[in-house]
Amino acid sequence: MYSAAHHIMPQIKKKTAQTPKFARQSAEARREMLIEAGIACLAKDGILGFTIDRICVKAKVSRGLITHHFKSIDGLLAAVYATMYGKMLAVIENPSVADDATPEKRLTAIIDAMFSREFFNRESLNIWLALWGEIANNPALLKEHRKQYARYRRGIERALGAVAIARGLKIDTPLVAMMFVSLVDGLGLEWCIEPKLLSARQAREACFKLLEPILGPLQ
């Protein structure tokens, strides 16, 4: 006689194909992952490090994902630019102050944020240098720059204009905004070239020295 054991079939574990991690993520999550990898590559090696191979290695994804989500490496670079600007625009358009804060406090909060460690640091400024240096040679990046820069200027104009209105002043708001933005960009460039010559505190004070003769005391 056969024992009962002969009639029991061994259990076979079904192997399930493991889905790659990036395939289980949403399209938006994959886009963000590639953008962050691109930012990291720019911070480390500048524009020369912004290559499909390096970005894909950093993000641990296949090369085809860049083309799928951004059409080209230039499309990804434009998305990186928009992301970098987006972080700054968030504090310009929604500064960390109470809803009933005065225009002066809102403007001061914007200046403080722009020279905080979150933005005024070696990594961030190196990324900006790499991006700025590429604008003139990259049509996709130039297009994105014009869009983001216009929004940036409008945000600064609104903050300056609100102070002027509250104080009954008539100023050339677009011109003052352009002067302010140019100063901020120049200070960032100066700090990148020779950090020992300029501190974040000094850069912040330079902005007030530009604006206070026009708007009056702000601090």
Regions found by a protein language model. Give the residues of each.
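Short, basic, alpha-helical segments at the C-terminal edge of helix-turn-helix-like DNA-binding modules
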Residues: A82-M88
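Hydrophobic alpha-helical connector segments
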Residues: A79, E93-S124, T173-F180
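Amphipathic C-terminal alpha-helical segment
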Residues: R117-F120, N137, F180-L198, P213-Q219
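Short helix-capping/turn signature of helix-turn-helix
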Residues: F70, A130-N137
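Amphipathic alpha-helical packing segments from all-alpha helical-bundle domains
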Residues: L89, E93-N94, F120-L129, P139-I165, ...
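N-terminal intrinsically disordered/low-complexity leader segments
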Residues: M1-A29, Q219
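Solvent-exposed, amphipathic alpha-helical segments
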Residues: M33, A37-K44, V91-P95, I127, ...
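Helix-turn-helix
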Residues: M33, A37-A79
